[in-house]
């Protein structure tokens, strides 16, 4: 697809169905619960006609990232940094995108959460998802990347 000539509908399809983005910061609509955030991403993939599957996948993803069920119906603005990041990762990864952009996906996560993130990244990679990430946690990256570029003093090494 030539993005310079793509229609708005084609670009929208790419953004909602083919691309995933994990930021170290959660940007969620106000009055949207943790469950709603993940479910919205799931529905973009599954569609309204497969709502039951989307619900089950959303619940499984929230559990995978240890987001306590007591938090599912709460607004994430009250969450810790690690909880927000895990929620953000769950919402991006539930889509099983073809391209996943990762901006510090392990920032503010404890080791147990990092293991879960790595496990899902490895699974997506095995399924053919292409990923481009920015990491400061070099230990986390070890053995995960096919190619690695290091920025030192403003230049790649």
Predicted feature locations:
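H-loop/switch region of ABC-family ATPase nucleotide-binding domains
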Residues: 135-136
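ABC ATPase NBD coupling module
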Residues: 2-20, 126
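Hydrophobic anchor residue at the start of the ABC signature
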Residues: 89
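Q-loop/switch helix immediately C-terminal to the Walker
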Residues: 32-44
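Helix N-cap at the start of a conserved alpha-helix in ABC-type nucleotide-binding domains
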Residues: 111-112
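Conserved ABC ATPase signature
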Residues: 75-79, 83
